[in-house]
Amino acid sequence: MIDLLDLAAELVDIPSESHEETALADLFERRLRDGSNLAIDRVGDSVIARSELNNEHRIVIAGHLDTVPANGNQQAHIDGDRLYGLGACDMKGGLAAQLATALAVDEPAVDVTFVFYPCEEVAAQYNGLSHLFESHPQLVDGDVALLGEPTSAAIEAGCQGT
């Protein structure tokens, strides 16, 4: 069983400011190739992991790899059950949950696509998810999508640039 707090802290400790997500993308690709039964694609610094069970429906679960620029707050710090550090909330905590889920899912009831993409924190013209929709739409096609952005536990409809 993966400890989500430890995994999130590990992700926080990997610098991944916008346009500099390669090291984090490499970690996601390596973990997914080594620990899942999913088909893995790499497009630049986007990592896509897909089940290929030919189920009737597909859910897309996506999260961005980048953070805002560091300001002396890069390193992870755990205090009890709370994690502090650059990107802990937006969105490396969500990424940890998504990665752990991708590693745990064997035979989902619906097909699933996990999309880990760069450049969400900057201008929409650089957004890695938008680039995937333009260049590789078959990799991000689905019936419904969930993004793990922090929303104070509220359901929100929308995404930058879409």
Each model region followed by its residue ranges:
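Acidic/histidine-rich catalytic neighborhood of metal-dependent amide-processing enzymes
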Residues: A96-G161
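Active-site metal-coordination/substrate-binding segment of hydrolases
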Residues: R58-F116, A124, G128
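Short, mixed-charge, low-aromatic patches
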Residues: H57-V60, G87-C89, G142-T151
